């Protein structure tokens, strides 16, 4: 009987451990949503499909219901469901989910956005800038930034990025972010007349660029902080950066949020969680580090509500909640490590094939990346022959060093910009630092071939 008591106690401890694990497994909003979906009550509120039952009344509707499954429709709910809180009030489990995401992503405040980072960018601009105020704007900005300036009445003062021989848009050079350079471009801006206060109130920079160029965010803040108090990084394609040390200091929410002082810039970041994290289409985050000229929650939320729907899609919010949970703790590093290692393997194989064909007097495609790197001992070595683990963990392998031919951005400040290893651009022959070659293969031909074989490229230009 003593053994039975002991076994029963151990079994109870195991059961308690399982219950604790399951209780802590799910993040706050999704946990509440999953729980509510199991409550089989009549629905007297929107949406009108009432948990999917309306679709059962017609053959086409039944096919739609069967395709997506019952849980989707049971979780498509209304703001009337008080148990889940409100996206507009940031209350209940939805509010708890935003606080959880802020902790995971290193922000003071985080907001769920259910209609993309285009809306996130507009929310920030409408909260920060008004008619005839000057905004410093990366010329390589998304159309939503231009739309936001139109809506707010802001006056853009563009900061011009570099461009290389491939046509790839590079970083804004650091000298263009200096206070003297900003003053000069403002003085030359015909939209800023004498009756307008020329002091910039907001700055927006795209980080990373579409081709994977990442700024040193500390350096950008150091430079632009001489001219403006609010910094806005459009990180639509870059929501994973906080979770791998290879990107250290190269994203808006770098470091410990507790170290961000009231005398530092107020920093905003927009991230499309649906692009390169595990969230549904249209899912986005706004992250905020509070500093100088902070926009408090009540004012910011007026802009948020102006852009948001009173009928948000709850599965989209839940997917944001889940992506935060997936990136929390050790999960984020494990997931990003896997992506980086796969990208490095692909890049090295492409470089090897390119070199092998060149030895035979033939051509092959390549990747836009360094031709050589320095190994752990400081020895220069061909990229294709470098230690893959070293490439996957050492940021210096990806930094744009001054006057290196491969990147084509000239005498750029060392350490200012880095190529993201997971953003792979395949290059086709036909152009180089010295101009057009004797023979070329337009990238559109390769893109058409890949598409015909079920591989859809994200972007195609002339030779990338």
Label each region the model flagged.
Residues 119-355:
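Conserved PLP-enzyme active-site core in the AAT-like
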Residues 2-5:
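Short, small-residue-biased leader/transition segments that mark boundaries at the very start
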Residues 341-464:
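Conserved C-terminal alpha-helix-loop-beta "cap" of PLP-dependent enzymes
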Residues 60-66, 109-112, 185:
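Short acidic/polar alpha-helix capping motifs at helix-coil junctions
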Residues 111, 157-159, 458:
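General small-molecule cofactor/ligand-binding pocket signal
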Residues 7-74, 79:
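Terpene synthase/cyclase
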Residues 99, 192, 258, 272-274, ...:
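Generic recognition of flexible, low-complexity loop/linker segments
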Residues 71-119:
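Conserved N-terminal alpha-helix of the aminotransferase class I/II PLP-enzyme fold
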